């Protein structure tokens, strides 16, 4: 049975990955719709014309009168709701919605909903692996991998969804079984008026949630709504009731729940305090939906991390090389610098820079001074980072990732680690952060 009123007209705005999933979904529901995109040649245009030749599509500047033919616009997350044409249509009574709102209406199985400025892909993947190890028929996606609407199936027993602030802007009621904001730090300041607006967008994830998971060391992760809901916490401190954290016994550090040690930290294959926090967050989310500890701990012991996320590449001349190209904001870079820096015997040589998206880099100064031997800077906002770091460590400016690797190898000493953690987006020099990470990995491989 369709939950969409079929005699109304919709327009899908944005023909990328999520937009195409909306097209497939609406077509299967028998709904009348059209498509619009600000780009002249959007990524999925050929697919749309091949599979749905009857669907009207408008490319280029958005036509407000065309948009106002619809009762509802399904806006892809890549397009800001502040876009004038969307605002004008909304002012004339057209509802703005998105794919996650539709997903929430149709999903029959419980949903674990995960957002945060950093670590959401790692935690989402890890929880999905835990659920699979527990024998659940689990579907994992959203902002990560498969679009939400493509995951819908009566066979699914549990959904694990990574959600971005952009997706949550068009989601009124998610109704997750358990929801979390892993952490909040400045990101996408080129799209938001400031941190409060970004914070409010993230916290839409808690609307209708039955349980919440809170980062006990980040006050901004605590829900603005939902007092009285079951609440589980995680953090790198000693846990108390309903809490996941770290306990120390006889010189050994353990992942723990309440007053019980679960497993030694040394058994994790991923290094750094930030990865310990990710493991604890995943345990809290899994526990909230009843996943058994034996399956969750077995998954933790096997988890080797995700590509481009503080990923160990190789050891060369006593120096370890880590690819954290996914660190596209200051908060992510801070997590890697603090987490890895406190976990190695030597110092870090940091490679950073790119498109800062209007971020404030001043928060990097203290941890860089504490954990780094030097910083090698590149990209559009290298000078802004240099100004923020001041005289905290020696600075070197280069033009390419290859040069950054070569100079970092000379600066590093035995026992050190070279860390690519840019604190910036990659689009000033690369197609995406994945390409940046691959170029870095290739340069590291070429060291001899």
Curated annotation (Swiss-Prot):
Major localization listed first in the record, in broad terms: cytoplasm
EC code: 6.3.2.9
Keywords recorded for this protein, A-Z: ATP-binding, Cell cycle, Cell division, Cell shape, Cell wall biogenesis/degradation, Cytoplasm, Ligase, Nucleotide-binding, Peptidoglycan synthesis
Disulphide-bonded residues: none
UniProt-annotated location(s): Cytoplasm
Record GO terms (molecular function): ATP binding; UDP-N-acetylmuramoylalanine-D-glutamate ligase activity
Catalytic reaction annotation: UDP-N-acetyl-alpha-D-muramoyl-L-alanine + D-glutamate + ATP = UDP-N-acetyl-alpha-D-muramoyl-L-alanyl-D-glutamate + ADP + phosphate + H(+)
GO cellular component labels: cytoplasm
Entry binding sites for ATP: 116-122
Pathway(s) served: Cell wall biogenesis; peptidoglycan biosynthesis
A biological process term (GO) from this entry: peptidoglycan biosynthetic process
Entry function: Cell wall formation. Catalyzes the addition of glutamate to the nucleotide precursor UDP-N-acetylmuramoyl-L-alanine (UMA).
Family: Belongs to the MurCDEF family.
Protein name: UDP-N-acetylmuramoylalanine--D-glutamate ligase
Organismal lineage: Bacteria, Pseudomonadati, Pseudomonadota, Gammaproteobacteria, Pseudomonadales
Gene: murD
């Amino acid at each position: 049975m369709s939950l969409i009123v079929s005699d109304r007209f919709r327009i899908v705005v944005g023909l990328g990955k999520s937009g195409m999933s909306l097209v497939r979904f609406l077509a299967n529901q028998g709904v009348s719709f059209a498509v619009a995109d600000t780009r002249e040649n959007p990524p999925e245009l050929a697919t749309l014309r091949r599979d749905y030749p009857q669907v009207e599509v408008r490319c280029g500047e958005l036509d407000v009168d065309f948009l106002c033919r619809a009762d509802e616009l399904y806006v892809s997350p890549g397009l800001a709701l502040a876009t004038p044409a969307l605002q004008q249509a909304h002012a004339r009574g057209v509802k703005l919605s998105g794919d996650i709102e539709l997903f929430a209406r149709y999903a029959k199985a419980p949903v674990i909903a995960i957002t945060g400025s950093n670590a959401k892909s790692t935690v989402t993947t890890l929880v999905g692996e835990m659920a699979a190890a527990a024998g659940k028929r689990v579907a994992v996606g959203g902002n990560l991998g498969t679009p939400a609407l493509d995951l819908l199936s009566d066979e699914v027993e549990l959904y694990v969804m990574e959600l971005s602030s952009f997706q949550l802007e068009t989601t009124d009621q998610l109704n997750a079984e358990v929801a979390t904001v892993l952490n909040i730090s400045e990101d996408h300041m080129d799209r938001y008026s400031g941190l409060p607006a970004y914070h409010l967008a993230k916290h839409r994830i808690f609307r209708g949630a039955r349980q919440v998971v809170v980062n006990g060391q980040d006050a901004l992760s605590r829900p603005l709504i939902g007092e009285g809901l079951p609440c589980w916490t995680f953090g790198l401190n000693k846990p108390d009731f309903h809490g996941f954290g770290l306990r120390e016994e006889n010189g050994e550090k353990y992942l723990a729940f309440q007053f019980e040690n679960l497993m030694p930290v040394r058994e994790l294959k991923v290094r750094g305090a930030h990865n310990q926090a990710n493991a604890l967050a995943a345990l809290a989310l899994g526990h909230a939906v009843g996943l058994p500890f034996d399956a969750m701990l077995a998954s933790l012991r096997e988890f080797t991390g995700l590509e481009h996320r503080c990923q160990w590449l190789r050891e060369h001349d006593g120096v370890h090389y880590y690819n954290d190209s996914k660190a596209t904001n200051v908060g992510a870079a801070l997590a890697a610098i603090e987490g890895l820096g406190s976990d190695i015997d030597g110092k870090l040589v940091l490679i950073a820079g790119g498109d800062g998206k209007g971020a404030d880099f001043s928060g990097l100064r203290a941890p860089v001074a504490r954990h780094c031997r030097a910083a090698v800077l590149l990209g559009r906002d290298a000078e802004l980072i240099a100004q923020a770091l001041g005289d905290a460590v020696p600075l070197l400016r280069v033009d390419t990732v290859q040069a950054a690797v070569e100079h970092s190898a000379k600066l590093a000493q035995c026992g050190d680690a070279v860390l690519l953690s840019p604190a910036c987006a990659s689009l000033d020099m690369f197609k995406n952060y994945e390409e940046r990470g691959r170029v870095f990995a290739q340069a590291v491989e070429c060291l001899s």
